Design a protein with these regions (language model features):
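Electropositive phosphate-/nucleotide-binding environments in soluble metabolic enzymes
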Residues: 37-44, 68, 152-155, 222, ...
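Short, small-residue alpha-helix embedded
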Residues: 47-48, 206-210, 271-281
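Catalytic-core segment of enzymes that process non-peptidic bonds
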Residues: 64, 98-101
Length: 281
């Protein structure tokens, strides 16, 4: 009997604004028709994808939904799936939300994030005695402020949490958020020591490992993918290290076997947007 998967961490409401183009500083752009509100964040995106893929797969959500209309919306949307257990979702504070600016021309997105209650989510908010799953997936490192805090023994509180999940017999899986700055090596690296599955994009991998994967000219350095994946394993990833990007997806298992697949060639206009694409991968 399948024990299932727990998706923990960020529970967010995304408000997506389609824009004509990304403006320069002090310039204006138009928001076009099609403003949408949807659930977002690692928990909501990943768990709803899994629920669609296998309606019989037991799923558990762990995170915070605020005492507000947005929190009601999150629970209502996830409650549509009979195989998602919401008993470990706590109502606390204000629901996190993200204003997503989606460029109509390039389909690229830019995110403006309000942490809300997510800022306080931590190890003690998980009912470890009742949690009985095969895989514990958490995201996002760099967007869960309490778990990003330092820990004298483990480096970060996130690393401590992941080790606890492993000691409880679960395989661990992590995701990170894309951001500018120098926090990747400091916050992601400690977590990798207690990670079985690491699935992140090329820019996040580059900032974590220091291996050049995409230059300032936008060119993808496919020839460096294997070295980057090897580095993730050296940093502690136990089972699968996976990198996804628009052009390809590639991975390396615990035995050093390297796999690479090109993206599907789809008709122009087929892809309506890329919000949640990384979680879906």
């Amino acid at each position: 009997m399948k024990k299932g998967i727990c998706c923990a961490g960020n529970m967010i409401v995304d408000i997506t604004y389609p824009i004509e183009t990304w403006p320069k500083q002090n310039e204006l752009t138009h928001i076009t028709e099609g403003i949408k509100q949807s659930t977002g964040g690692s928990v909501c995106n990943t768990i709803s994808d899994l629920a669609r893929l296998d309606p019989q797969l037991p799923l558990v959500a762990s995170g915070f939904a605020g005492h507000d209309a947005e929190g009601d919306f999150v629970l209502q949307e996830m409650g549509k799936y009979k195989n998602i257990d919401l008993s470990m979702v706590k109502r606390n504070g204000r629901t996190s939300f993200t204003a997503v600016m989606s460029n109509n021309q390039t389909k690229e997105r830019t995110f403006f994030q309000h942490a809300g209650a997510n800022a306080y989510y931590g190890e003690d908010d998980i009912d470890w005695d009742k949690l009985d799953v095969d895989i514990f997936h958490i995201g996002y490192i760099l967007l869960l402020p309490h778990l990003d805090e330092p820990d004298a023994e483990y480096g970060t509180k996130m690393a401590r949490l992941l080790h606890r999940a492993q000691k409880a017999g679960m395989k661990t899986s992590i995701d990170v958020v894309s951001e500018a700055g120098e926090r990747f090596a400091r916050l992601v690296t400690p977590a990798l020591k207690y990670t079985d599955y690491c699935i992140i994009n090329e820019l996040e991998t580059q900032q974590t490992t220091g291996v050049l994967l995409r230059g300032e000219d936008g060119v993808l350095h496919v020839e460096n993918m294997k070295a980057a994946l090897q580095k993730l394993h050296e940093l502690g990833v136990a089972k699968w290290a996976v990198i996804h990007c628009p052009e390809i997806g590639c991975g390396m298992d615990e035995n050093g076997n390297y796999y690479e697949f090109e993206s599907l060639k789809l008709p122009k206009g087929y892809i309506k947007g890329t919000v949640g694409a990384g979680d879906a991968f």
